[in-house]
């Protein structure tokens, strides 16, 4: 008997809380299909604060081994965190970490939700977090997710107290408890309510757990086990899923065997966690060998895009496509088109910027309405690379023009030249546009006429920027915003995301450029070396100060490379990511002994350090940081040359900082070191390890845990003045 299948297509909207639609569809393996047919009805919602907080091993075991329906609710998108992959911070980092969550869910089989809370950086108190999050809004989002997903059980990753170690972590548990209690109240009035709330505890918080047994509100679960349908164990899958959090450096050796997990009942009635026993499914595969995709001619949707839906029948049976039409997509399908085995059918489904954007749904059944199958497709742009092979990326709604600059922040002494790049997308006809700038605290010359040639997507130009002769008294910073004549909306900047474990895409952010107009003195003739870390703006910041920067390869570093340099700056987290520093250490130390200045930016005190030996004078890193960016600084050595030359630093240099003062301060150091600053978050003891410096032979070594990498990008004048003093130290008569 031959089965025939019909399709119905229409647009749908994705909820802001739910998971994304699929970029394309192909029939699962028979083993995966039967795995998905298991009739276990347990639904579990796992809640934590950030991308990477979730226990992917436990989620994978529940989802893929036990057959439970699992979802993860991340209250933030992690935009306030660190990035070991590259220079992206803020909104761009949030997109990277959001996509890493989706990549993890594609492996562990869970659904992904978001809570819409802002990741404003590390927080030491739950009170600060709840205030900045607007706890009622986040609580409402948690309740909305719970009502949509309808879990039997809610599981938090963190305890609802200070043991969680981060205000965001604590707040995620506190709000989960409040949401559970409110829903329980609704349940008593006849509404839906989850049955129990557990905390996924571990020996990290309770050292005596290793010998614990189930009972007294504690459940001890043994997880792990081979899944024949997938050819992997649940721990393997969970490890691979965790490895998708590459921006946080969470890939590692694949876990196998068994693992013990602990669940502490916080609210509600105990749940029976006995693993279910399954009976092998004998249900027939609905449509084996079905493939469908929706592809467009470009990844950028400005006005409209030609696009097509393609259906490929690789099964042994015919399928049928029912006529459908959607006004937003322009999809036209002839009625009752039969698609024979081995055949491909394609029809236009164009995209329009003024239409309703969402996923295209293919509802698949046979002619008798059996074997129902719903496929939700999102449009993609497909290309290829001779090394990487097929490359797919999402189609994005895109403005016609965007602006970019050579620098993340412009330092204007008296005047400066700024290189500007005007990009355009969509159709590329020959055209002329008028570009102009509005400056706050700076003066920009006349408007720029830009003439694009047919097919030209970017125009490069330079503009003159200078301080106004009569500026605002005391103004040391400003901004520059670009417009096109006839358009009152400022141009945005597109940040390209190009990491192969997540879809390539652009992140559209505010296109205004921070400007620093403060008086910054920099000695002439400074020549500085830079060794890469995890990605920061130090080279650009130094060039803005008029410093000549030489890029150095740590793995092949020689004394000849260092000849003539007064300082060498290591990028942020260099000792966490740059293996070449192991070989470079003896060379750098010899150079310091003979008069060089080694400047080490912040590194994390983790096991991934390439070496514990971070300089010629010993010091150790701790986990101290100051997170309240308004915290006043106490100058411990106000007359030290690094505090006075060539710029006399003052409290004003710590005004306007963003997110934090510094992180991963030194916790122990040789007596040769001089700590330059002292400060503390409210209620804490003062910390002195943020900025320490010591002589070594005829040279100097400095560890600077200040968050300069954030402040340079934000246009904080004091961060540039501090940088100038760091670089100029060896010209102040303290070395060769």
Name these PLM-found stretches.
Residues 20-148, 170, 174-181:
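Active-site rim/loop-helix segments in enzyme catalytic domains that contact anionic ligands
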Residues 20-45, 125-129, 135-291:
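Metal-dependent de-N-acetylase/amidase catalytic core
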Residues 273-301, 381-411:
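Low-complexity, acidic Ser/Thr/Pro/Gly-rich terminal tails and inter-domain linkers that flank the onset
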Residues 330-355, 442-470:
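Intrinsically disordered, low-complexity Pro/Gly/Ser/Thr-rich segments with frequent PxxP/GP/PP motifs
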Residues 352-387, 469-508:
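Terminal connector regions
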Residues 489-571, 604, 710, 728-736:
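Aromatic-Pro/Gly-enriched surface loop or interdomain linker
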Residues 573-655:
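A glycine-rich, often tryptophan-bearing local segment used as a flexible ligand/cofactor-contacting loop or short
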Residues 625-716, 731-735:
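Catalytic beta-strand/loop cores that center a nucleophilic Ser/Cys/Thr
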